[in-house]
From Swiss-Prot:
<feature type="binding site">
    <location>
        <position position="141"/>
    </location>
    <ligand>
        <name>Fe(2+)</name>
    </ligand>
</feature>
<dbReference type="InterPro" id="IPR004313">
    <property type="entry name" value="ARD"/>
</dbReference>
<dbReference type="GO" id="GO:0010309">
    <property type="term" value="F:acireductone dioxygenase [iron(II)-requiring] activity"/>
</dbReference>
<keyword id="KW-0533">Nickel</keyword>
<keyword id="KW-0028">Amino-acid biosynthesis</keyword>
<keyword id="KW-0560">Oxidoreductase</keyword>
<comment type="pathway">
    <text>Amino-acid biosynthesis; L-methionine biosynthesis via salvage pathway; L-methionine from S-methyl-5-thio-alpha-D-ribose 1-phosphate: step 5/6.</text>
</comment>
<feature type="binding site">
    <location>
        <position position="103"/>
    </location>
    <ligand>
        <name>Ni(2+)</name>
    </ligand>
</feature>
<comment type="subunit">
    <text>Monomer.</text>
</comment>
<comment type="similarity">
    <text>Belongs to the acireductone dioxygenase (ARD) family.</text>
</comment>
<dbReference type="GO" id="GO:0010308">
    <property type="term" value="F:acireductone dioxygenase (Ni2+-requiring) activity"/>
</dbReference>
<dbReference type="GO" id="GO:0019284">
    <property type="term" value="P:L-methionine salvage from S-adenosylmethionine"/>
</dbReference>
<keyword id="KW-0408">Iron</keyword>
<dbReference type="GO" id="GO:0005506">
    <property type="term" value="F:iron ion binding"/>
</dbReference>
<keyword id="KW-0223">Dioxygenase</keyword>
<feature type="binding site">
    <location>
        <position position="99"/>
    </location>
    <ligand>
        <name>Ni(2+)</name>
    </ligand>
</feature>
<feature type="site" description="May play a role in metal incorporation in vivo">
    <location>
        <position position="96"/>
    </location>
</feature>
Length: 181
Protein backbone atom coordinates (compact mmCIF):
# COMPACT_ATOMS: atom_id res chain seq x y z
CA UNK A 1 0.00 0.00 0.00
CA UNK A 2 1.31 3.45 -0.89
CA UNK A 3 1.97 5.77 2.01
CA UNK A 4 3.32 9.18 2.96
CA UNK A 5 5.31 9.75 6.15
CA UNK A 6 5.99 13.39 7.06
CA UNK A 7 8.95 14.23 9.30
CA UNK A 8 10.40 17.43 10.69
CA UNK A 9 14.08 17.59 9.73
CA UNK A 10 15.00 17.55 13.43
CA UNK A 11 13.04 14.31 14.10
CA UNK A 12 14.11 11.63 11.61
CA UNK A 13 13.02 8.80 13.92
CA UNK A 14 9.43 9.95 14.48
CA UNK A 15 7.05 10.99 11.69
CA UNK A 16 4.60 13.81 12.45
CA UNK A 17 2.00 11.93 10.44
CA UNK A 18 1.58 8.86 8.27
CA UNK A 19 -1.03 8.83 5.51
CA UNK A 20 -2.28 5.82 3.55
CA UNK A 21 -5.33 7.08 1.63
CA UNK A 22 -4.71 8.29 -1.92
CA UNK A 23 -6.71 11.49 -1.43
CA UNK A 24 -4.80 12.41 1.75
CA UNK A 25 -1.42 11.68 0.18
CA UNK A 26 -2.28 13.60 -2.98
CA UNK A 27 -3.65 16.67 -1.18
CA UNK A 28 -0.71 16.88 1.24
CA UNK A 29 1.82 16.65 -1.59
CA UNK A 30 -0.17 19.05 -3.79
CA UNK A 31 0.39 21.78 -1.17
CA UNK A 32 4.02 21.67 -2.33
CA UNK A 33 3.37 21.38 -6.05
CA UNK A 34 3.93 17.61 -6.12
CA UNK A 35 1.37 15.62 -8.11
CA UNK A 36 0.50 12.11 -6.91
CA UNK A 37 -2.05 9.96 -8.67
CA UNK A 38 -2.94 6.39 -9.51
CA UNK A 39 -2.81 5.15 -13.07
CA UNK A 40 -3.59 1.60 -14.03
CA UNK A 41 -0.50 -0.49 -14.72
CA UNK A 42 -2.51 -3.34 -16.23
CA UNK A 43 0.17 -5.06 -18.29
CA UNK A 44 2.20 -7.46 -16.14
CA UNK A 45 5.89 -6.51 -16.12
CA UNK A 46 8.63 -8.31 -14.23
CA UNK A 47 11.43 -6.28 -12.62
CA UNK A 48 14.48 -6.76 -14.80
CA UNK A 49 12.38 -6.46 -17.99
CA UNK A 50 14.07 -4.53 -20.79
CA UNK A 51 13.35 -0.88 -21.52
CA UNK A 52 11.93 -1.87 -24.91
CA UNK A 53 9.49 -4.36 -23.35
CA UNK A 54 8.22 -1.83 -20.81
CA UNK A 55 7.86 1.05 -23.26
CA UNK A 56 6.04 -1.21 -25.73
CA UNK A 57 3.65 -2.46 -23.03
CA UNK A 58 2.84 1.07 -21.80
CA UNK A 59 3.06 3.03 -25.05
CA UNK A 60 -0.50 4.41 -24.70
CA UNK A 61 0.05 5.81 -21.18
CA UNK A 62 3.47 7.18 -22.14
CA UNK A 63 2.08 8.93 -25.22
CA UNK A 64 -0.74 10.43 -23.14
CA UNK A 65 1.69 11.86 -20.58
CA UNK A 66 4.07 13.14 -23.25
CA UNK A 67 1.27 14.85 -25.17
CA UNK A 68 -0.56 16.30 -22.14
CA UNK A 69 2.51 17.48 -20.26
CA UNK A 70 5.09 18.13 -22.96
CA UNK A 71 7.68 15.51 -22.06
CA UNK A 72 10.20 14.76 -24.79
CA UNK A 73 12.19 11.82 -23.44
CA UNK A 74 11.25 8.56 -21.77
CA UNK A 75 13.32 5.81 -20.23
CA UNK A 76 12.81 2.92 -17.86
CA UNK A 77 14.54 1.84 -14.70
CA UNK A 78 13.89 -1.85 -14.16
CA UNK A 79 15.79 -3.57 -11.37
CA UNK A 80 15.58 -6.82 -9.52
CA UNK A 81 17.71 -8.25 -6.72
CA UNK A 82 20.03 -9.98 -9.24
CA UNK A 83 21.14 -6.74 -10.91
CA UNK A 84 24.96 -6.60 -10.84
CA UNK A 85 25.07 -2.84 -10.14
CA UNK A 86 22.26 -2.64 -7.59
CA UNK A 87 24.51 -1.40 -4.76
CA UNK A 88 26.11 1.34 -6.91
CA UNK A 89 22.76 2.49 -8.28
CA UNK A 90 21.20 2.54 -4.82
CA UNK A 91 24.08 4.60 -3.44
CA UNK A 92 23.79 7.14 -6.28
CA UNK A 93 20.02 7.57 -5.96
CA UNK A 94 20.28 7.83 -2.14
CA UNK A 95 22.25 11.07 -2.33
CA UNK A 96 20.13 14.20 -2.01
CA UNK A 97 19.86 15.91 -5.37
CA UNK A 98 17.60 18.07 -7.50
CA UNK A 99 16.85 18.43 -11.19
CA UNK A 100 16.40 21.42 -13.46
CA UNK A 101 13.13 19.90 -14.66
CA UNK A 102 10.17 18.04 -13.19
CA UNK A 103 10.87 14.45 -12.21
CA UNK A 104 8.04 12.13 -13.25
CA UNK A 105 7.82 8.45 -12.39
CA UNK A 106 5.09 5.93 -13.21
CA UNK A 107 5.58 2.73 -11.20
CA UNK A 108 4.42 -0.28 -13.22
CA UNK A 109 5.82 -2.98 -10.90
CA UNK A 110 7.25 -3.25 -7.41
CA UNK A 111 7.94 -0.30 -5.13
CA UNK A 112 10.42 2.39 -4.11
CA UNK A 113 10.72 5.13 -1.49
CA UNK A 114 10.78 8.61 -3.03
CA UNK A 115 11.77 11.13 -0.33
CA UNK A 116 11.38 14.90 -0.71
CA UNK A 117 13.14 17.55 1.37
CA UNK A 118 10.97 20.67 1.36
CA UNK A 119 11.86 23.51 3.74
CA UNK A 120 12.03 22.05 7.27
CA UNK A 121 10.16 18.85 6.40
CA UNK A 122 10.88 15.51 4.79
CA UNK A 123 8.10 13.71 2.90
CA UNK A 124 8.77 9.99 2.41
CA UNK A 125 6.46 8.67 -0.31
CA UNK A 126 6.29 4.90 -0.62
CA UNK A 127 5.40 4.45 -4.29
CA UNK A 128 4.03 1.16 -5.54
CA UNK A 129 2.62 -0.29 -8.74
CA UNK A 130 0.07 2.12 -10.30
CA UNK A 131 1.54 5.24 -8.62
CA UNK A 132 2.40 8.29 -10.71
CA UNK A 133 4.46 10.98 -8.98
CA UNK A 134 5.57 14.29 -10.47
CA UNK A 135 8.07 16.33 -8.46
CA UNK A 136 8.64 19.97 -9.46
CA UNK A 137 12.01 21.08 -10.79
CA UNK A 138 14.41 22.18 -8.07
CA UNK A 139 12.89 20.02 -5.31
CA UNK A 140 15.56 18.35 -3.17
CA UNK A 141 14.97 14.60 -2.96
CA UNK A 142 16.43 11.10 -2.98
CA UNK A 143 15.18 7.65 -3.92
CA UNK A 144 15.64 4.32 -2.18
CA UNK A 145 15.05 1.07 -4.02
CA UNK A 146 16.12 -1.09 -1.06
CA UNK A 147 18.99 -3.53 -0.71
CA UNK A 148 17.15 -6.02 -2.91
CA UNK A 149 15.41 -3.88 -5.53
CA UNK A 150 12.22 -5.08 -7.13
CA UNK A 151 10.62 -2.37 -9.24
CA UNK A 152 9.98 -0.97 -12.69
CA UNK A 153 9.40 2.75 -13.18
CA UNK A 154 8.84 4.67 -16.38
CA UNK A 155 10.65 8.02 -16.22
CA UNK A 156 9.59 11.02 -18.30
CA UNK A 157 11.66 14.14 -18.95
CA UNK A 158 11.44 17.60 -20.52
CA UNK A 159 15.19 17.44 -21.10
CA UNK A 160 16.30 15.42 -24.15
CA UNK A 161 19.39 14.36 -22.16
CA UNK A 162 17.22 12.43 -19.67
CA UNK A 163 18.18 12.04 -15.99
CA UNK A 164 20.57 14.84 -14.98
CA UNK A 165 21.07 15.23 -11.22
CA UNK A 166 22.57 18.17 -9.35
CA UNK A 167 23.77 16.74 -6.05
CA UNK A 168 23.45 19.01 -3.00
CA UNK A 169 26.31 17.51 -1.00
CA UNK A 170 24.06 17.32 2.08
CA UNK A 171 23.99 14.13 4.15
CA UNK A 172 20.34 14.42 5.23
CA UNK A 173 19.27 11.25 3.37
CA UNK A 174 21.37 9.11 5.69
CA UNK A 175 19.44 10.32 8.74
CA UNK A 176 15.98 9.23 7.57
CA UNK A 177 14.39 5.78 7.26
CA UNK A 178 15.12 3.77 4.17
CA UNK A 179 13.06 1.25 2.28
CA UNK A 180 12.75 -1.98 4.20
CA UNK A 181 13.06 -5.03 1.98
Amino acid sequence: MSSLSVYHVSSPDMPNKVLTHLEDIASTLAEHGVAFDRWEAATPITPGASQEEVISAYRTQIDTLMTERGYVTVDVISLNSDHPQKAELRARFLEEHRHGEDEVRFFVAGRGLFTLHIDDYVYAVLCEKNDLISVPAGTRHWFDMGENPHFVAIRLFNNPEGWVANFTGEDIAGRFPRLED
